[in-house]
Amino acid sequence: MAAPILKDVVAYVEVWSSNGTENYSKTFTTQLVDMGAKVSKTFNKQVTHVIFKDGYQSTWDKAQKRGVKLVSVLWVEKCRTAGAHIDESLFPAANMNEHLSSLIKKKRKCMQPKDFNFKTPENDKRFQKKFEKMAKELQRQKTNLDDDVPILLFESNGSLIYTPTIEINSRHHSAMEKRLQEMKEKRENLSPTSSQMIQQSHDNPSNSLCEAPLNISRDTLCSDEYFAGGLHSSFDDLCGNSGCGNQERKLEGSINDIKSDVCISSLVLKANNIHSSPSFTHLDKSSPQKFLSNLSKEEINLQRNIAGKVVTPDQKQAAGMSQETFEEKYRLSPTLSSTKGHLLIHSRPRSSSVKRKRVSHGSHSPPKEKCKRKRSTRRSIMPRLQLCRSEDRLQHVAGPALEALSCGESSYDDYFSPDNLKERYSENLPPESQLPSSPAQLSCRSLSKKERTSIFEMSDFSCVGKKTRTVDITNFTAKTISSPRKTGNGEGRATSSCVTSAPEEALRCCRQAGKEDACPEGNGFSYTIEDPALPKGHDDDLTPLEGSLEEMKEAVGLKSTQNKGTTSKISNSSEGEAQSEHEPCFIVDCNMETSTEEKENLPGGYSGSVKNRPTRHDVLDDSCDGFKDLIKPHEELKKSGRGKKPTRTLVMTSMPSEKQNVVIQVVDKLKGFSIAPDVCETTTHVLSGKPLRTLNVLLGIARGCWVLSYDWVLWSLELGHWISEEPFELSHHFPAAPLCRSECHLSAGPYRGTLFADQPAMFVSPASSPPVAKLCELVHLCGGRVSQVPRQASIVIGPYSGKKKATVKYLSEKWVLDSITQHKVCAPENYLLSQ
């Protein structure tokens, strides 16, 4: 750690890139801490210095208002290199956006990932305060409980218990107490497993349908606060007269207006069976609020259809409207309303499973009906919905059911109660086993022509169809490109399967191309396309080609690269024939017309196999014309040079990791360079953190590179672009650097120095340091000749243990290094190795 030269400094760091997407504050914060400064995370009154670059305007204004010293990042670097507290006035900060309008200034969004620290009460003060507040609130609730609030506690094993402090007057609470006590006695879980449900159904099959563990009195359900204006009217007034059809149509149209689902929830669907229908006496006074709350809770269970897919809001809305239409047709029939006792048996099979199946297949209703029916308000809809539904439930109750209902009904009946076991079991059955239930609904009475038309308009026949179909190859290829927006059953399906870049689809196209080659006349050939990768029940689902244009482009790019890679491996005609049969033919033809270089590079067997197909070429003329537009952007991208990596490389040497991180971030920001670990042919700049003679510095000098200090990067970061290198060149420490750079700039071809051009052949000892390869490279770059054997050399570099000759000079490695550094051949007498 450096000396605490900035021990009296309290700094606030705000260093951003010029476009506001990169935050470099962390690196300079580390440097300040190493120098003994205290870094504040917030701009408080203790801050004495603000390290500022392209920061927020508010920070700049606050610093100027308080008189805090505003310095640039160069001040931090100068203090670190000098090892002393430098005067701040020498490195003032600049605010480039000070005079810009607030409309022009961009919002900042740092693209760097943040360090995620899990918040706990120990490391987060706000979380600790919230935790303490919750603990105090819980303690207050335990000590100061209201008289009418029951206590729900959990035992150590997790079971729910009920511990009332005083007697509760409300019947609602007493009913809940009975229910919880009953659950505790029976050891009944809130959410029993499937094995528990099956065990309950086997233990008590006779009482599973009419079990009513709790009896709620009429007074509890009929409190005055739950009544709305029109709820006292009887069911006959609402749904039994001739005006019921108009009301139902208003109700159905209002569903779209208020965007609420009328899917029958499992709680409401239970009423369609015998066990949970309310009595005739109390139905017109049942609570609408409770009904609606139960409906909203249980709608969640119906948002997934039986196949496990999530139903979108549009599908739910349309499904609810189609379901409402079915119920309206059956309920509004004069025969049905007048002879309830006779027709109840036929409408019994309309169970929850059938209704849910219908929800999953619902489709959108005609838009004309939507416009006509947007009239009712939210207040008038839901009570009517409840009452009409309740009247529909009444029609499903037979004579024996009324006797069973006289024992009472539980208002806390939940989905996991044993009463609903039969219904839940029917939901879990596969869709095929539930399909035979739906024709029972249509057998209630004959439908009129208008009703049949509306049912067919709302039905989805996409699942009815053949699993294989015949497509003509002419239509298949021509409509692939010429009519991309047409999504017919045959052509659209074939197009989507050929354009997709998935491997299975590509193999399918290969098989199609192979079949076409086998026939003598390709234009009139008709064959069957099979879709093995598609799931059953979705054979005729069509994919619009508008959404797959990107996939078409990717397919073109992918196949063109595959052609380049695969054609180079083909050596004879038979292999070329096999290759052409295993890829989509229209891609091959397009590539042949796109690049003349690829035509020349193709082997004879491959090009012959393409040319010998006149039928295919005729068929696919339109395909190539369509794909030319897709290939043009790729060619333009190549011509413009975008997307390529930078050809210049930058090498760092004698630089600590924190400086390297800054350089990497600046290079990523300003572009134009890629970073290399060692000097190579593409290296143009060598950055040296300290003026030390390293191998990378010597190689950079020998190759004519810029040898620069670290300040060049900082000033480039300050100004937002790469600046001139000359003021930052380390020519004082390495005099040869500017000379070699000038020679490299003036040379016409590849640069090679002339320093050792007049010297005899040299042999580099294997025991030399630096390594042999690097020394040989240095000698070669400076124009010298390196011999592989010592007997052919007049100069031996490095320690040599063999037999020595009097005519050979045995020199130290430093002779080469010093000569390159000073750009002159040093006197060999000063570097002779001892005999």
Curated annotation (Swiss-Prot):
Implicated in chromosome condensation and DNA damage induced cellular responses. May play a role in neurogenesis and regulation of the size of the cerebral cortex. InterPro entries: BRCT_dom (IPR001357), BRCT_dom_sf (IPR036420), Microcephalin-like (IPR022047), Microcephalin_mammal (IPR029504). This is Microcephalin. The modification Phosphoserine is found at residues 279, 287, 296, 333, 548. Its main location: cytoplasm. Residues 1-93, 640-730, 751-833 form the BRCT domain. The modification Phosphothreonine is found at residue 335. Residues 343-361 have a biased composition (Basic residues). Interacts with CDC27 and maybe other components of the APC/C complex. Interacts with histone variant H2AX under DNA damage conditions. Keywords: Cytoplasm, Cytoskeleton, Intellectual disability, Phosphoprotein, Primary microcephaly, Repeat. PANTHER family: MICROCEPHALIN (PTHR14625:SF3). SMART domains: BRCT (SM00292). One of its GO terms (cellular component) is cytoplasm. GO terms for molecular function: identical protein binding. GO terms for biological process: bone development; cerebral cortex development; establishment of mitotic spindle orientation; mitotic cell cycle; negative regulation of transcription by RNA polymerase II; neuronal stem cell population maintenance; protein localization to centrosome; regulation of centrosome cycle. Disulfide bonds: none annotated. It is linked to Microcephaly 1, primary, autosomal recessive: A disease defined as a head circumference more than 3 standard deviations below the age-related mean. Brain weight is markedly reduced and the cerebral cortex is disproportionately small. Despite this marked reduction in size, the gyral pattern is relatively well preserved, with no major abnormality in cortical architecture. Affected individuals have mild to severe intellectual disability. Primary microcephaly is further defined by the absence of other syndromic features or significant neurological deficits due to degenerative brain disorder. MCPH1 deficient cells exhibit a delay in post-mitotic chromosome decondensation. It is found in: Cytoplasm, Cytoskeleton, Microtubule organizing center, Centrosome. Residues 313-381, 419-443, 555-584 are annotated as: Disordered. Expressed in fetal brain, liver and kidney. BRCT domain 1 is required to prevent abnormal chromosome condensation. It binds directly to the SWI-SNF chromatin remodeling complex. BRCT domains 2 and 3 recognize phosphoserine/phosphothreonine marks on proteins with high selectivity, and mediate interaction with phosphorylated CDC27. They also mediate the dual recognition of phosphoserine and phosphotyrosine in the C-terminal tail of histone H2AX. The gene is MCPH1.
